[in-house]
Swiss-Prot record:
Gene: ligA
Enzyme Commission identifier(s): 6.5.1.2
Reactions it catalyzes: NAD(+) + (deoxyribonucleotide)n-3'-hydroxyl + 5'-phospho-(deoxyribonucleotide)m = (deoxyribonucleotide)n+m + AMP + beta-nicotinamide D-nucleotide
List of residues binding NAD(+): 29-33, 73-74, 127, 158, 270
GO annotation (BP), single: DNA repair
Species in which this protein is naturally found: Ruthia magnifica subsp. Calyptogena magnifica
KW Aminoacyl-tRNA synthetase (keyword) present: no
Keywords: DNA damage, DNA repair, DNA replication, Ligase, Magnesium, Manganese, Metal-binding, NAD, Zinc
Listed GO MF terms: DNA ligase (NAD+) activity; metal ion binding
Official protein name in the record: DNA ligase
Length: 614
């Protein structure tokens, strides 16, 4: 890891994550969590990996279907201090709804290390990106059973293999249980040992609501935390990589809600007690997309929590200067979350070497608060490359445009995303890509244009300062994408969640990207338009905020009906479950959908009935 730049580390984490979720891990789960991901978190806390649900690997079909309900990730804590802060957030929310703090109830369950899925009773989906996943219903058709012979349709859970069974019958053939779990899901026919594991009920789907639990009042959790963790970790004969804690009180969960990635009323605890005293060999400056210089600390190779650590982040040069983190320093090191190397404190300070010039463009650096910064934003190679790669990463509907590809394009005078979209196969071959690779890259560019993305994601991909995904969505809830470049400071500052300082930054940011935005926008991206808040507030129809499924042949285009439904505040799903409110039927409806609706108590209405209610 010591040879990796920030961008390369992020790319490696993405590759490792995809390989892990595809059932072909290239490093252990602990190494990923506590070495690489933690290093990335320390170097680049705003990286996309920490803001969005981790997607599964490309081993699954690229054809994705809408999940019956969103499957969020779980926030993680690696110490009692972080759990304590989570409890304080619970208590703060409880006070806001006048809930007695002594009445807060907590549930703890084992955090399974399997393949996440959602079972709606008729289909099984992978988690995918949390909104769309792959249909892997074939795994039930192959005979997979639900844990404890429970019924189908119990929602989110994981496909797992019993630890004792894996150790006895499968460890000689598979390096990790995930490799075997993946073989159950793949489209190819099952081999004999996989089929036997299913028959023996060693491989199972476990709905989370069927997991054994500890439950009690929050005061008991505080008093017996270590004991409860130890108890929960051994509750099941499956691979477990932590303990999930969640509030039980329904009104408290509603109050706390969720962000894009996880529910705030839930957290997963992972523990790492290993520490080491390590000598610093070097401190190397690296340039990020925004021009911030991150000090990368090279360390004497040290075995920690089963992995050899050779690198950690110094966060910023202000901290390096304050701590005396220089060549020859001795630091106390741990693996935060059992994955990422983290310097706890400097035991032996040494003189530090503060760089004067940017390591990428050699221009003088300036201090901005605790950060050394390269302000040569338009011409610094590292920043230009980082911004181009960032566009494709945020857009998230393409493959192939990682740092290595972008660096090669930069070496052949490509300096902007709009220049990339103007390339053809012949151009790429001339640059030095193979013909097949060139064809794939062009196909991915076309895919990024045709495959629908949210308009706020498209805007965020341009990488304006302070305009991440959340702020871009907030802006587009008040003004349409086509109108934002005409907004003045007052109009932006008046948006809820913004203020004058943020407004000034946004105005300048929009000016800086306007030309590039127009060049790229002309390619006709398939953008999903954000509904304006003022329009949502005028929606008073009976089906507002209800979940519906359309089925059968309609008088209107099914796609048009879905788009219209979403535009007026209706949540559209693709399959029947207990979470659905209405099934809207046209002609030639399959009886299975009708029976599923009856089974789950879903109200059935005709297309005419539906139109009359909106």
């Amino acid at each position: 890891m010591d040879e990796l730049s920030d961008e390369e580390l992020a790319q490696f984490c993405q590759i490792a994550n995809l390989a892990y979720r595809a059932g072909k891990p290239i490093i252990s789960d602990q190494d990923y969590d506590f070495i690489y991901l933690d290093a990335l978190k320390n170097r680049d806390p705003d990286n996309l990996l920490f803001k969005f649900i981790e997607t599964e690997g490309q081993s699954f079909s690229e054809e994705k279907v809408l999940l019956p309900e969103a499957m969020l990730s779980i926030d993680k804590a690696y110490s009692w201090d972080e759990i304590s802060k989570w409890i304080k957030r619970l208590e703060k929310s409880a006070m806001q709804i006048s809930l007695d703090l002594s009445a807060i109830q907590i549930k703890a369950t084992p955090k399974l290390d399997g393949f996440s899925g959602f079972d709606d009773g008729s289909r099984l989906y992978t988690r995918g990106d949390g909104k769309k996943g792959s249909d892997i219903s074939r795994v039930f058709e192959r005979g997979l059973c639900v844990f404890n012979d429970a019924e189908r349709g119990l929602g989110a859970g994981e496909i797992v293999i019993k630890k004792s069974y894996f150790k006895k019958y499968l460890a000689h053939s598979f390096e990790y249980p995930r490799n075997f779990q993946a073989s159950l899901i793949k489209e190819k026919a099952l081999d004999e040992q996989a089929q036997k594991a299913i028959i023996d009920k060693a491989a199972l789907f476990i709905p989370f609501i069927k997991l054994p639990t500890w439950s009690g009042l929050v005061a008991e959790l505080v008093a017996k935390f270590d004991q409860i963790v130890a108890q929960v970790l051994v509750m099941v004969d499956f691979d477990v990589d932590g303990v999930v804690f969640e509030a039980i009180n329904t009104d408290l969960k509603t109050q706390m809600g969720a962000n894009r990635k996880f529910h705030r009323w839930q957290i997963a605890f992972k523990e790492n007690k290993d520490k080491a005293h390590v000598k610093v060999l070097n401190v190397i400056p690296q340039v990020g997309r925004s021009g911030k210089i991150t000090p990368v600390v090279e360390l004497e190779p040290t075995l920690l929590s089963g992995a050899t650590i050779m690198r950690a982040t110094g966060h910023n040069y202000g901290l390096v200067k304050e701590q005396g983190l220089g060549v020859g320093s001795v630091v106390e090191l741990t693996r935060s979350g059992l994955v990422i190397p983290k310097i706890i404190f400097v035991l032996k300070p040494m003189p530090v070497d503060i760089p004067d010039n940017c390591p990428s463009c050699d221009k003088p650096l300036v201090w901005k608060s605790d950060f050394l910064t390269c302000i040569n934003h338009k011409n610094c190679p590292a920043q230009i490359i980082g911004k181009m790669a960032y566009f494709f990463k945020i857009l998230a509907n393409n493959d192939g445009f990682g740092i290595a590809t972008i660096e090669k394009l930069y070496a052949h005078d490509i300096r902007s995303v709009s220049q990339i979209y103007a390339l053809n196969i012949e151009d790429l071959v001339t640059i030095g890509f193979g013909e097949k690779t060139s064809m794939n890259l062009i196909n991915q560019l076309n895919r990024s244009v045709s495959e629908q993305v949210e308009d706020w994601r498209f805007l965020a991909a341009f990488g304006m300062h302070r305009m991440g995904l959340g702020n871009c969505e907030n802006l587009l809830k008040s003004h349409h994408l086509n109108d934002i470049f005409d907004l003045n400071l007052k109009e932006i500052a008046n948006i809820d969640g913004f203020a004058e300082l943020t407004g000034q930054i946004i105005v300048q940011g929009l000016i800086s990207i306007a030309d590039e935005f127009n060049h790229i926008y002309q390619y006709g991206f398939n953008l999903e338009t954000t509904i304006l808040t003022k329009d949502l507030q005028t929606l008073t129809h009976e089906l507002f905020d209800k979940k519906i499924v359309f089925t059968g042949k309609m008088n209107h285009s099914r796609d048009d009906m879905k788009k219209h439904a979403k535009s007026i505040g209706i949540k559209v799903s693709t399959s029947i479950s207990a979470k659905i409110d209405y099934l809207v039927i046209g002609d030639k409806v399959g009886q299975k959908k009708i029976k599923d609706a009856e089974k789950f108590g879903v109200v059935v209405m005709t297309e005419t009935d539906y139109l009359s209610k909106i």
